[in-house]
Curated annotation (Swiss-Prot):
InterPro entries xref list: AAA+_ATPase, ATP-dep_Clp_protease_ClpX, ATPase_AAA_core, Clp_ATPase_C, HslU, P-loop_NTPase
Species for this entry: Burkholderia thailandensis (strain ATCC 700388 / DSM 13276 / CCUG 48851 / CIP 106301 / E264)
Identification of the protein by name: ATP-dependent protease ATPase subunit HslU
Organism superkingdom: Bacteria
Family per record: Belongs to the ClpX chaperone family. HslU subfamily.
UniProt subunit comment: A double ring-shaped homohexamer of HslV is capped on each side by a ring-shaped HslU homohexamer. The assembly of the HslU/HslV complex is dependent on binding of ATP.
Gene: hslU
Function noted in UniProt: ATPase subunit of a proteasome-like degradation complex; this subunit has chaperone activity. The binding of ATP and its subsequent hydrolysis by HslU are essential for unfolding of protein substrates subsequently hydrolyzed by HslV. HslU recognizes the N-terminal part of its protein substrates and unfolds these before they are guided to HslV for hydrolysis.
GO MF annotations in UniProt: ATP binding; ATP hydrolysis activity; peptidase activity; proteasome-activating activity
Residue sites binding ATP per the record: I18, G60, V61, G62, K63, T64, E65, D259, E325, R397
An example Gene Ontology biological process: proteolysis involved in protein catabolic process
Annotated GO CC locations: HslUV protease complex
């Protein structure tokens, strides 16, 4: 679990997302409250439930990006799903219980990786020993006494020399033959609605049939070291302990990001008599959000302390169009602002992995130095903003389209400009995009 303070979380989010301070603060406080709750003594700890968040804002302003970055910071099981993927129980489609099943799978993988990192050093030593056994087989005892001891001493000295060379990477390209455990290949079985548990049991039964088989393979030492390290680390893990920790991690620290929640409101589907009931999906989500117990292949999982963050553009619907019970389960409401020209400028240059830095790095691979003048950045931002206003407002995603069109010729002919510098100023932007951005019909299709 992350032990970062709210200020530190916001500072990290600022490196990747421009503006939206209210949303960042709400998410940072919610994440910090997970840690605070763990410091509270029982039985009060059980009574403290997370305050779920509803993020409201147009598309392309950072709702999903905040969730994505939060996942990396949280160091906790995290899943992002679209609410539109789910249907009411009884209809063809996924039911909402699969959210928790997917989350526990993520947690098991995360916990396994954490536990494997703890034993990796020891596993690497054992993997090196197995490789050295192939390169330098143990000498057979032919003589007696001193001669055998002398042979063993020589072999140990040689092994140490080879181990040093192995660690320095001098033997990486040498090929050896090894018996390597085969990874189990899962079977894909289509699950009928409501029978996911039975399908999961059948799948695990079939996957266990092939486990433990070894195959003799010829591999390079670099790859062999990785395969054997993973194999040795897996042997050291206690699977039951991993499952228990994973379930506990989901129950105490799990985060579910429900995207497009506005698309399952009744306002969005008025008059659709033959449609799957969206209100039914809301009613199915309700017990999950307020706390229930879901049966998974790793055991029973309680959802009482899982944090739910929902988001939606709410163009056609309002948060009040959600069923009242579900509205009450998202007490923290945060509105995200539409992006201004200044925001677009900052998105282009101010973030850690800004679009400008990405394109500069891509063209640098072909020895083309791409320079952006301040007036060029300003003009790009103005065009992106203007096209959003005139056509459909897709937020920051418009910048991808605009900059891709702008650099189309440079990217295509990069090989001919090796060793040269290309400066993008306002005049260059106007030449490349001026006509397209002014013509509304053209910009609808091109930008």
């Amino acid at each position: 679990m992350s032990t970062m303070t709210p200020a530190e979380i916001v500072s990290e989010l600022d490196k990747h997302i421009i503006g939206q301070d209210k949303a960042k603060k709400a998410v940072a406080v919610a994440l910090r409250n997970r840690w605070r709750r763990q410091q509270v003594a029982e039985p009060l700890r059980q009574e403290i439930t997370p305050k779920n968040i509803l993020m409201i804002g147009p598309t392309g302003v950072g709702k999903t990006e905040i969730a994505r970055r939060l996942a990396k910071l949280a160091d906790a099981p995290f899943i992002k799903i679209e609410a539109t993927k789910f249907t009411e129980v009884g209809y063809v489609g996924r039911d909402v219980d699969s959210i928790v099943r997917d989350l526990i799978e993520i947690s098991v993988k995360q916990t396994r990786e954490t536990e494997m990192r703890k034993v990796r050093s020891k596993a690497t030593d054992l993997a090196e020993d197995r490789i050295l056994d192939v390169l330098l087989p143990q000498p057979r005892a032919v003589g007696f006494g001193a001669s055998v001891e002398h042979a063993n001493d020589d072999n140990n000295a040689t092994r140490q020399t080879f181990r040093k060379r192995l660690r320095e990477g001098q033997l990486d390209d040498k090929e050896i033959e090894l018996d390597i455990e085969q990874p189990t290949v899962g079977m894909d079985i289509m699950a009928p609605p409501g029978m996911e548990e039975m399908t999961e049991q059948i799948r695990s039964m079939f996957s266990n049939l092939g486990s433990g088989k070894k195959q003799r393979r010829k591999v390079k030492i670099k790859e062999a070291l990785k395969l054997l390290t993973d194999e040795e680390a897996a042997k050291m893990l206690n699977d039951e302990e991993v499952k228990t920790k994973a379930v506990q991690n989901v129950e105490q620290n799990g985060i579910v990001f429900l995207d497009e929640i506005d698309k399952i409101t009744s306002r969005n589907h008025e008059g659709g008599g033959g449609e799957v009931s969206r209100q039914g999906v809301q009613r199915d989500l309700l017990p999950l959000v307020e706390g229930t117990t879901i049966n998974t292949k790793y055991g029973m999982v309680k959802t009482d302390h899982i944090l739910f963050i929902a988001s939606g553009a709410f163009h056609l619907a309002k948060p009040s169009d959600l069923i009242p019970e579900l509205q009450g389960r998202f007490p923290i409401r945060v509105e995200l602002d539409s992006l201004s020209v200044k925001d677009f400028e900052a998105i282009l240059v101010a973030t850690d992995a800004s679009l400008v830095k990405q394109y500069q790095a891509l063209l640098a691979t072909e020895d083309v130095a791409l320079e952006f003048a301040d007036d060029g950045i300003r003009r790009l931002a103005e065009i992106a903003y203007a096209v959003n206003e005139k056509t459909e407002n897709i937020g920051a995603r418009r910048l991808y389209t605009v900059i891709e069109k702008l650099l189309e010729e440079v990217s295509f002919a990069a090989g001919n400009h090796a060793g040269q510098s290309v400066t993008i100023d306002a005049a260059y932007v106007d030449r490349a995009l001026g006509e397209v951005s002014k013509d509304e019909d053209l910009s609808r299709y091109v930008l």
